[in-house]
Amino acid sequence: MGKKYIESAKLIDKSALYNPVEALDLTLKTAKANFDETIELHVRLGVDPRHADQQVRGAVVLPNGTGKTVRVLVFAKGDKAAEAQQAGADFVGADELVQKIQSENWFDYDVVVATPDMMGIVGRIGRVLGPKGLMPNPKSGTVTFDVAKAIEEIKAGKVEYRVDKTAIVHCPIGKKSFGTEKLKENFTALMEALVKAKPAAAKGQYLKSVSVSSTMGPSAKVNPTRALD
C-alpha cells in the first residue's frame, strides 16, 4: 500500500456514514494521484443476482457526462449505417467488423450499438464481446433502430450499470476535475436510476451500502438512507 494512500485513508473515518456531499468532498481531498482520477460509485443492493427476476441492469445519461471520450462501434447497414456515421459513430460496419474482431482480437472501442436486424451476425462474436461487457443489449438501449439517438446519448455521458455476482453495482460518475457539485448531480442521477430499477422480487432493504472512491484513493461510505438527499 502506497504512502499517499495511507495518508489519504487517515482523512476518512472508516466507521462513519457521510451524506453524499461530504463523501464526495473527502473523495476529492484524498484523490492525490498525478492524473485526473475517475470517481466511482459503488452500491451493494439487497438482491440475489442468481435469480433472473432480481437482475438490476440499465443505463442512465449523467447530466455532466463522464469526462471520458467514448468510442462507439455500430453494426448497421444501408441508411442506418449512414445515419450512424452522421451521428458521430467512430466505427460503422457489418460482417467486415465481425471478421476484424474475430481475426485481430480488436477492441479499440468502448461501446457497441447494433440495429436489431444485425444481432444475428453480432451473435457470432457474443462470446468475445460478452465477457468484456460490450455485447449490445435492448435494456441498455444499445440494440435499436434509432442509432442516432443511441450514439448521441452515449457521447453525452450515458453509462450502463449492472449488478455483479456479489450484488454490487460499480459505476463511474465523472472525474476529479468535475468538482463536488457536478459529481453530486451525476451521483444523484445514477442513484435515482438504481432505485427506479428495483426488481419487484427484491425483498427487505434495497440499498445495503453506498460508497464513493477515486481510482487510487480510499472509499468514503455514504449513509444509504441519505443517498438521495
Swiss-Prot record:
This is Large ribosomal subunit protein uL1. GO terms for cellular component: large ribosomal subunit. HAMAP family: Ribosomal_uL1_B. Belongs to the universal ribosomal protein uL1 family. Keywords: Repressor, Ribonucleoprotein, Ribosomal protein, RNA-binding, rRNA-binding, Translation regulation, tRNA-binding. Part of the 50S ribosomal subunit. It comes from the Bacteria.
